[in-house]
């Protein structure tokens, strides 16, 4: 189901809680909401649709990948950039890593480990920041 985007900075600034198998529908809602906003958005965290759970979705080109309880396990090659966010106005400076490795659970609750680089790594880092209440 397509959800409304949360723009409440106080809400977004609060950390999320671990996701469980009971939260699968939230992942589906993220898929629907990202699809509805695809012209202006490439990733989303569950708190952006009003749910404080550790769930994100990242556009990886031709597919959108939902990650439950994602954790960055390695990172390298730091750089500075500017980013925008559906929940905020304008763009802001931030620091990211060119390459990351992330562990997460998929829809089947199978643990995955994936190496990401460039734009996809940047999107993933932005969304994982949302989970800890960090806003660009």
Language-model segments: which ranges?
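Positively charged
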Residues: 1-136
